[in-house]
Amino acid sequence: MREAGRGGSPVLVLHGGPGPAGVAPLVEHLASDHRVVAPTHPGWDGTVRPGDLDSVPALAAAHLGLLGRLGLRDVTVIGTSFGGWVATQTALDDREGRISRLVLVDAIGPVIPGQRITVPTGPPAPASQGGPSAQAMAALRAYAGPTMADADLLPRLSTVTCPVLVLWGVDDTVVTPDFGRAYAAAFPHARFELVPGAGHQPIREKPETVFTRLDSFLTPRTSATGH
């Protein structure tokens, strides 16, 4: 787990397939105004995934446990790609009201009619191109299952009443902007924004645009409704 920053409201950053390196620029940016907690999902970067940690709900429970151990409340959770699915599940399962805002960046998770998740079938892309390692892909499959989606997720999103920002690369071919629009529309209080010139990894491809959108969403903070 990485922690950065000392003041301001807490932010939990959940990485996607490429691992912690994929969100490192975001962590650095947020650390100037926030306390940032960026855990490594077990199974990435040489970490061991326990056998009973084999689903997205189990991983979300682990991250909620981390927030509890750290005593954090009024938490903004940010997740990208697979991390967005975990972030969504974390918000759904937050029985103690620790989470006040949710940010999804080109997130996967729900089954959306007429849309699909296009997972590359060739060898993993090199890390220099933001690709996940073979170990990361194995962990991803263990958590996400063969379909990389949860058929029961979409109708449950109406219960997440905190403010939600959904950012999407306009050129994403893994999960298209139409997927993102439908994802956002399932939340009661979400806004959807496209990131021009970006594909599935806007944090790597257009970091300044992402940071500007995030800063606008997070500052000034307004009261959240909770759930």
Region locations from a protein language model:
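Short beta-strand/loop motif that positions the catalytic acidic residue
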Residues: 160, 166-168
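Catalytic active-site module of serine/aspartate enzymes centered on a nucleophile-bearing elbow/loop
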Residues: 190-191, 197-227
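Flexible "cap/lid" loop of the alpha/beta hydrolase fold
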Residues: 85-93, 98-128
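Active-site loop/oxyanion-hole signature of alpha/beta-hydrolase fold enzymes
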Residues: 37-78, 204, 212-215
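Hydrophobic, aromatic-rich cap/lid helix
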Residues: 125-155, 159
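Acidic catalytic loop of the alpha/beta-hydrolase fold
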Residues: 171-175
